[in-house]
Structure formats: C-alpha cells, structure tokens
Amino acid sequence: MGLTVVYAKETWHVLGAVQSTGGASGVPDAGPLVGASLELRGIRALPGPAESGAAPIAVPVDELAAAAVDAASDLDGFPAVLTTPFAFGVTVVNEQPKSALVPLNDGWGPSPVAATTRRITVTLPQPVAEGSPALVLVAVGAGPPRSLPALVTGPQLTIDTNLSAGVYPVLTLVRGVAARIDAVQVSA
C-alpha cells in the first residue's frame, strides 16, 4: 500500500494524507490530489458567528507539495498520519522530501493566537528554534486566505496585518511544531 501526504512547502507540515491500495506510482504533484486548494477543517474553538458554519481554510495549491512516505502505524495498525496529519512533518533534505515522517511538538497553550485589526500575535510552545519559518493563514471570506510568512525570533510571533473586527479561521504553521487551526476573535 502506498501512502502520500500533502504538505506545506515552507514549513513541511503534513496537512493531509491518502493511502492507495495500488503499488507506488511515483510522487504526484499536489494539484491533482487537491485541485486549486486543500480545504482544512478542525477549528478548536468557535466563538460567535463562526459557530453557525465558519468557512474552512483553503490552502492554495501553490503553498503545497506532495510526497510518498513510509506508513508508520499507531497501536491499531493504521497509519497515524491518516487520522492526525497535523501531528507530523515531512523530512526534507536538500529541498527534497524523504520517506520518513517526523512527529511534531504539540505543546500549544489553550489560546495561543490573539489578534487585533492591525496585528496577529502567536505565543509559541517551547522550544522552537530561532529562525524557524512560520506561516499564518487567515481565511478572509470566499477568496484565498491571507498568507502571512514570518521567522521565529523569540517566544512569540508578531505579524502586522489589516483585518476587520470579527471571527476568522486561522491556520498556524511553525516548523517543528504541530499545525493548529483556531477561530480567532479580531478586536479593534
């Protein structure tokens, strides 16, 4: 059985996985697997209007890549990456994905993302290596999410942005740390 993951190019986070019953047929491009974007759901807390059907975050295909990986199994003999993809990262060497997945640190606090109309602040679990790439994606209506890249320079990421007050789905990707989706209340 083959196992293919779709991952974030910049931070190497696994965002989705599929298992095929056929033999390995090479590594596909992410596009044929996800189309124009990969819709992610899994918001941990939905305050306010988002409870009635917040849009998922649709990660654009140009932010994604695909890789054939080893199917390490959990206790039930089922590849754990199929049930908890956000908990894994792809091993990348010389810009090429390898077949081994790595488990990621999930030491997030209960509400690590705070936002105002001018800035998003993410409190990071520790330790996170200085200079690690990060990507925060904010779903803003029906269009593509706002992509906010950053580098880790301390215990928090602070990213300038321009948002209206309201509740937004936010995907946080920091290399080495489990991916996370939250509904974030943006205050004035």
What label would you give each PLM region?
Residues 9, 140-142, 176-178:
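Solvent-exposed strand-loop boundary residues in beta-sheet-rich modules
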Residues 184-188:
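Short beta-strand edge segments in extracellular beta-sheet folds
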Residues 115, 152, 163-165:
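Surface-exposed coil/turn segments at beta-strand junctions on protein surfaces, enriched
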Residues 127-146:
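Extended low-complexity, serine/threonine- and proline-enriched intrinsically disordered segments
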Residues 140-158:
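Solvent-exposed serine/threonine-rich low-complexity stretches and specific carbohydrate-binding patches
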Residues 135-137, 163-183:
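Short, aromatic- and glycine-rich surface loops/edge beta-strands on solvent-exposed regions
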Residues 80-129:
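Extracellular ectodomain segments of secreted/surface proteins
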Residues 1-97:
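Long, contiguous interaction/targeting segments characteristic
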